[in-house]
Amino acid sequence: MSMSHIYTVVRCPRCGKPVPWNETQRFRPFCSERCRLIDLGSWANEDYAIPGEPIDPAEPSEDRNGAEGPPTD
């Protein structure tokens, strides 16, 4: 067996279908454009969320350097 036929198989995050992890799979890790777009829509609808502390919009934000938001002249 040639080494070029060995590849990893992952599961589509949307439907669970096996997907070969190689250059020929255009929508990897998804099995199809449909599953990719459904997943994108789920993010847009805020069905998914990355855990974190709630943000209070009344408090000024700080950037990585510790500076506060834009000047309020």
UniProtKB/Swiss-Prot annotation:
Residues 47-73 are annotated as: Disordered. It comes from the Bacteria. GO terms for biological process: regulation of DNA-templated transcription. SUPFAM superfamilies: Glucocorticoid receptor-like (DNA-binding domain). Its cofactor is Zn(2+). Disulfide bonds: none annotated. Binds 1 zinc ion. Pfam families: YacG. Zn(2+) binds at residues 12, 15, 31, 35. Keywords: Metal-binding, Zinc. GO terms for molecular function: DNA topoisomerase type II (double strand cut, ATP-hydrolyzing) inhibitor activity; zinc ion binding. Belongs to the DNA gyrase inhibitor YacG family. Interacts with GyrB. HAMAP family: DNA_gyrase_inhibitor_YacG (MF_00649). Inhibits all the catalytic activities of DNA gyrase by preventing its interaction with DNA. Acts by binding directly to the C-terminal domain of GyrB, which probably disrupts DNA binding by the gyrase. This is DNA gyrase inhibitor YacG. The lineage of its organism: Bacteria, Pseudomonadati, Pseudomonadota, Gammaproteobacteria, Methylococcales.
